[in-house]
């Protein structure tokens, strides 16, 4: 699937190594390969954006390697492609040898997979399903500040789905573990690939059922009910968390204004 980059190849360039992204001038590179010293490198086309190819190059650059979070303000589609590139680069880097027999592996020519030439085992990129849920109580929404977000941002609750668990069960468990409350009338909204490091966020809205807020201090710094017209600092636009909050605010406005 990959090939040698030629002088006139052009498009968007996702140059990634160890979950980092090359961002010269803080931007995702766009243009001809020669402008970025990429001629002769191997590249894999991972999609298209506005009619232009998006290429993955597995390479470490000496300068300007940053987090894919730095391009979160890009259009959602381009951000997702950048995230795909970072995840694929890490997948190929971490699957050089077979986990079953220890022999060297090679990339498939027909799909995103690594193949073992010895035992014929086939590996695909790992995706970790997560739930994220906006909980409404009358004219208020439950927002929390997570221990990993010490920048004042308040967001909705989220967590990983466990083995043998449905998405609905994961919502109920995560909400209870993190906040101590029960929810009802769960409704699926949307999903979003989230490359930190390899999650697929499944987004829900729910209504408060019962219980008082009792936070898990390992997960949250604080959690509280916030009236829809008096909210704290929120996640940036383009994130599924922001989408859930805005949808909840719209519902509250429709009822209370």
From Swiss-Prot:
A motif (Nudix box) lies at residues 159-180. Changing residue 194 to A: Abolished deNADding activity. Its cofactor is Mg(2+); Mn(2+); Zn(2+). Zn(2+) binds at residues 98, 101, 116, 119. One of its GO terms (biological process) is NAD catabolic process. Residues 125-248 form the Nudix hydrolase domain. GO terms for molecular function: magnesium ion binding; manganese ion binding; NAD+ diphosphatase activity; NADH pyrophosphatase activity; protein homodimerization activity; RNA NAD-cap (NMN-forming) hydrolase activity; zinc ion binding. A divalent metal cation 1 binds at residues 158, 178, 219. Optimum pH is 8.5. A divalent metal cation 2 binds at residue 174. Keywords: Hydrolase, Magnesium, Manganese, Metal-binding, NAD, Zinc. Substrate binds at residues 25, 69, 111, 124, 192-199, 241. Divalent metal cations. Mg(2+) or Mn(2+). A divalent metal cation 3 binds at residues 174, 178, 219. Changing residue 178 to Q: Abolished deNADding activity. Changing residue 214 to A: Abolished deNADding activity. Homodimer. Belongs to the Nudix hydrolase family. NudC subfamily. NCBIfam families: PRK00241.1. mRNA decapping enzyme that specifically removes the nicotinamide adenine dinucleotide (NAD) cap from a subset of mRNAs by hydrolyzing the diphosphate linkage to produce nicotinamide mononucleotide (NMN) and 5' monophosphate mRNA. The NAD-cap is present at the 5'-end of some mRNAs and stabilizes RNA against 5'-processing. Has preference for mRNAs with a 5'-end purine. Catalyzes the hydrolysis of a broad range of dinucleotide pyrophosphates, but uniquely prefers the reduced form of NADH. This is NAD-capped RNA hydrolase NudC. It comes from Escherichia coli (strain K12). The gene is nudC.
């Amino acid at each position: 699937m990959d090939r040698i980059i030629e002088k006139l190849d052009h498009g968007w360039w996702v140059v990634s190594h160890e979950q980092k992204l090359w961002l010269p001038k803080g931007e995702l590179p766009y243009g001809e390969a020669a402008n970025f010293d990429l001629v002769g490198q191997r590249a894999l086309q991972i999609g298209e954006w506005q009619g232009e190819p998006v290429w993955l190059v597995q390479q470490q650059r000496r300068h300007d390697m940053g987090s894919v979070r730095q391009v979160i303000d890009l259009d959602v589609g381009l951000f997702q492609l950048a995230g795909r590139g970072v995840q694929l680069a890490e997948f190929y880097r971490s699957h050089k040898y077979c986990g079953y027999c220890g022999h060297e592996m090679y990339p498939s020519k027909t799909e995103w997979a690594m193949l073992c030439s010895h035992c014929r085992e086939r590996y695909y990129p790992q995706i970790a399903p997560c739930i994220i849920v906006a909980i409404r109580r009358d004219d208020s929404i439950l927002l929390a500040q997570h221990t990993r977000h010490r920048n004042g941002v308040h967001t909705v609750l989220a967590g990983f789905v466990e083995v043998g668990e449905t998405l609905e069960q994961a919502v109920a468990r995560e909400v209870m573990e993190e906040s101590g409350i029960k929810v009802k009338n769960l409704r699926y909204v949307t999903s979003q690939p989230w490359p930190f490091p390899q999650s697929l966020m499944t987004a829900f809205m729910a209504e408060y059922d019962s219980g008082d807020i009792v936070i898990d201090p390992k997960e949250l710094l604080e959690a509280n009910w916030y009236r829809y017209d008096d909210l704290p600092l929120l996640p940036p636009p383009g994130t599924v968390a922001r989408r859930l909050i805005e949808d909840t605010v719209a519902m509250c406005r429709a009822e209370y204004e």
